[in-house]
A protein has these predicted regions:
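Poly-acidic low-complexity segments
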Residues: 11, 39, 55, 88, ...
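Residues that recognize and position ribonucleotide moieties
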Residues: 1, 8, 85
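Short secondary-structure capping/turn micro-motifs that flank functional sites
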Residues: 1, 52-53, 115-116
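Secondary-structure end/capping motifs
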Residues: 17-102
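A bilobed periplasmic-binding-protein/Venus flytrap-type ligand-binding module shared by bacterial periplasmic
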Residues: 4-20
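Conserved C-terminal helix/tail region of periplasmic/extracytoplasmic solute-binding proteins
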Residues: 90-122
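Short Pro/Gly-enriched coil loops immediately N-terminal to beta-strands
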Residues: 1-4, 92
Length: 122
């Protein structure tokens, strides 16, 4: 079962009151994500530096393995060539349909009720 699961959750009031803040945050986040995709060891080293007391990060190679696995899942086939975080309307609808059928999502809704690509750069 393929479902979308990662994303940035934003309160509707923030969208209404400060959309430029969301744009700036997502611009920085997508730049960081794109850089980390090309430089995974450097990204992991920065994470270890930020959280030196993390028992998980202290395990040699574990953080890099997890990053590589997670990174591979972050780009849905329909989002190929897009900025990190961009989602295809079809993928969102597929996820909504699965959740409505198997997880009793109600009301079912449509993409615009849950997701937008409008604040992403590019």
């Amino acid at each position: 079962m393929n479902t979308l699961s990662d994303g940035v959750i934003v309160n509707r009031d923030l969208i209404r009151d400060n959309p430029e803040l969301i744009r700036r945050f997502l611009r920085a986040a997508t730049r960081a994500w794109s850089y980390a995709e090309v430089n995974p060891q450097e990204a992991v080293d920065a994470l270890i530096k930020m959280f030196p007391d993390s028992s998980f990060l202290a395990q040699p190679g574990q953080a890099l393995k997890q990053w590589e696995g997670h990174s591979a899942l972050m780009r849905a086939p329909r989002a190929e060539g897009r900025v990190p975080g961009w989602v295809a309307p079809e993928d969102v609808q597929d996820t909504i349909d699965l959740l409505a059928e198997y997880a009793e999502l109600s009301p079912k809704g449509k993409m615009d009720d849950y997701v937008t690509n409008a604040f992403l750069p590019g």
